[in-house]
Swiss-Prot record:
Cu(+) 3 binds at residues 18, 22, 24, 33. It comes from Helix pomatia (Roman snail). The modification N-acetylserine is found at residue 1. 14 cysteine residues are arranged in C-X-C groups. These are thought to be the metal-binding sites in other metallothioneins. This is Copper-metallothionein.
Length: 64
């Protein structure tokens, strides 16, 4: 675990240990890995999610 599926380059060369929700840039940022968040109906869940680990979007973002 640790390589963000949407991350590349320097991030995957020195991957996060928090799963697939890391945010890349100058470094790997795992501050949102433990929460579910939505962006234009594209959700990502972290370690606090249950089940399949997918999100439901809309008026509220939640894990399903």
């Amino acid at each position: 675990s640790g390589r963000g599926k949407n991350c590349g380059g320097a991030c995957n060369s020195n991957p996060c240990s928090c799963g697939n929700d890391c945010k890349c840039g100058a470094g790997c940022n795992c501050d949102r890995c433990s929460s579910c968040h939505c962006s234009n109906d594209d959700c990502k869940c972290g370690s606090q999610c249950t089940g399949s680990g997918s999100c439901k979007c809309g008026s509220a973002c939640g894990c399903k």
